[in-house]
Regions:
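Phosphate/nucleotide-binding beta-alpha loop and adjacent structural elements of enzyme active sites
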Residues: 1-235
Length: 235
């Protein structure tokens, strides 16, 4: 009896020792961490970063010693990043396809569903609190202003249906992130529920085609997040 109990305790201890904690909403960070094989000094670019810890795809990497750029259109979110990750580059910007004044469909401070996309906003069950006019810029302009010399190992993009607008003004051939995770929203999908998604819907999307045409391979799909790896990183 005692021997059996001790074996059980040892099993529990080993299980706890090798337990991996995810900070992402859908465990995307565990997949990214696995892809990079525990790389300790990488560089990330997170557009639509929202919160520095909770439901965040880069916090696990940050804890491993990575650093990077976090961009969010909500100043209160960026204030949190400046507190939790003061050595990162934290930018309160609205990223889109051009420099312009656009409508922000605002639900509340720190809301994960604040969006520049009216169609996505109309699809949401929640009620828009306010429509604000904000100035947008592009990712290319932002990175050029930073005079970025770092190789982007990992890029995360989560901006509530506005992802393709960002890619329109982002030179993938120049910056060439090794790995990209991106939120996939198809408004033809019932209730935007991932259980109603399918592979055919993904490969027929403009998002998939754009990344595929820029030498990215689709390697994983978690809930509403798609993960792509650049051909050079694979080879």
């Amino acid at each position: 009896m005692l021997e059996s109990f001790l074996r059980y305790l040892n099993l529990c201890r080993r299980k706890y020792k090798y337990k991996k904690i995810s900070y992402s909403l859908n465990a995307v960070d565990l997949i990214i961490d696995y892809i990079f094989k525990n790389k300790n000094n990488g560089f990330y670019l997170d557009v639509g970063s929202q919160h520095p810890i909770s439901n965040n795809n880069t916090y696990l990497l940050f804890k491993r010693g990575w650093s990077g750029i976090n961009i969010d259109l909500d100043k209160k979110n960026i204030d949190l990043f400046n507190t939790a990750r003061p050595n990162d580059i934290n930018l309160n910007l609205a990223i889109s396809s051009d420099v312009a004044e656009k409508n922000l469909y605002f639900y509340h401070d720190k809301s994960p569903i604040n969006t520049l996309d009216k169609v996505v906003s109309d699809f949401q069950a929640a009620t828009v609190k306010e429509i604000k006019t904000i100035k947008t810029t592009t990712l290319d302009i932002t990175l050029q202003s930073l005079k970025l010399n770092n190789k982007i190992d990992y890029m995360n993009l989560d901006i509530e249906g506005h992802e393709m607008e960002i890619f329109k003004a982002f030179d993938l051939s120049l910056y060439k992130p090794s790995v990209i995770s991106v939120e996939f929203l198809d408004l033809n999908m019932k209730y935007l529920e991932f259980k109603n998604n399918d592979l055919q819907r993904i490969v027929n999307s403009d998002l998939y085609k754009h990344l595929h045409n820029n030498n990215y391979h689709f390697v994983n799909w978690l809930h509403g997040d798609l993960i792509f790896v650049h051909r050079d990183f694979r080879d």
